[in-house]
């Protein structure tokens, strides 16, 4: 039987990057329905955010991510890559951004969203 890592509970962390506020959340989610419910909850809680980027990996094979309006490949994929690199399963990560008025550029977005997932 193959072993795999799962989060032991929910987590939250915040940081500021060039005046943009990032809030990272991680959740244990055992089904795709649970992952989508958590995403809905975050979108309702942070309804006024500029972006709610997410990625999830469910052990049964469901893997999804979204840039939520950020330039393609600069937000959801870096979040997913952090989860994959850490070999996590049954996990949903949502990184919320409140735009601070300064454009971060593609590289800055990748670094910021990856940091939010860590």
Model-derived features: positions:
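Glycine-rich loops and low-complexity Gly/Arg-rich segments
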Residues: 49-53, 79-82, 117-118
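Signal for well-folded cores of large energy- and translation-related assemblies
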Residues: 43, 83-88, 114, 118
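Glycine- and Gly-Pro-enriched alpha-helical subdomains that act as flexible
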Residues: 92-96, 102-118
């Amino acid at each position: 039987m193959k072993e795999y890592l799962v989060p032991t509970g929910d987590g939250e962390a915040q940081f500021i990057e060039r005046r943009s506020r990032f809030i990272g959340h991680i959740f244990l989610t055992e089904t795709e329905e649970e992952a989508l419910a958590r995403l809905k909850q975050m979108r309702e809680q942070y309804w006024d955010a500029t972006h709610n980027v997410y990625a999830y990996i469910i052990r049964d094979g469901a893997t999804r991510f979204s840039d939520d309006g950020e330039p393609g490949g600069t937000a959801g994929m870096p979040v997913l890559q952090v989860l994959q690199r850490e070999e996590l399963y049954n996990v949903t990560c949502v990184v919320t951004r409140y735009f601070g008025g300064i454009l971060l550029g593609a590289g800055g977005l990748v670094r910021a969203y990856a940091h939010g997932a860590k």
